[in-house]
Amino acid sequence: MANRTIIAFDFGTKSIGVAIGQEVTGTARALTAFKAQDGTPDWQQVEKLLKEWQPNLVVVGLPLNMDGTEQPLTARARRFANRLHGRFGVQIALQDERLSTVEARANLFDRGGYRALDKGSVDAASAVIILESWFDEQAG
């Protein structure tokens, strides 16, 4: 297995969570959350992050309904992924992110109660779950 560095984004219209991980260990950690204006981040911040970490792959969470069908936000997440590829030339993978926010909120609450549930922390923790889910799928 390659030791690729992978960044994951939890796309949202107001905030975009970010996590980083190593494929060889299959683990991820929260990095940050970017403010977004109707789904559009500060692209300079994104560029700085990508230059700093130089990921081999970027995983973008794909928000689906519980039955697996797409919702309006699904197309916006795909567009965000396409823009990442177009602007920065990074390889993209999409990952089902159903229930990642619910799981992230529960994990953070277990560690720090309501004080731990600020929006940025939840979004970055969701990105961790998205990336670890992607690792699990790759491992089979």
From Swiss-Prot:
The keyword Hydrolase applies. It holds the Pfam family RuvX. Could be a nuclease involved in processing of the 5'-end of pre-16S rRNA. Belongs to the YqgF nuclease family. It is found in: Cytoplasm. InterPro entries: RNaseH-like_sf, YqgF, YqgF/RNaseH-like_dom, YqgF/RNaseH-like_dom_sf. Disulfide bonds: none annotated. Transmembrane segments: none annotated. GO terms for biological process: rRNA 5'-end processing. The gene is yqgF. CDD domains: YqgF (cd16964). GO terms for cellular component: cytosol. It comes from the Bacteria. Keywords: Cytoplasm, Hydrolase, Nuclease, Ribosome biogenesis. Its EC number is 3.1.-.-. This is Putative pre-16S rRNA nuclease. GO terms for molecular function: nuclease activity.
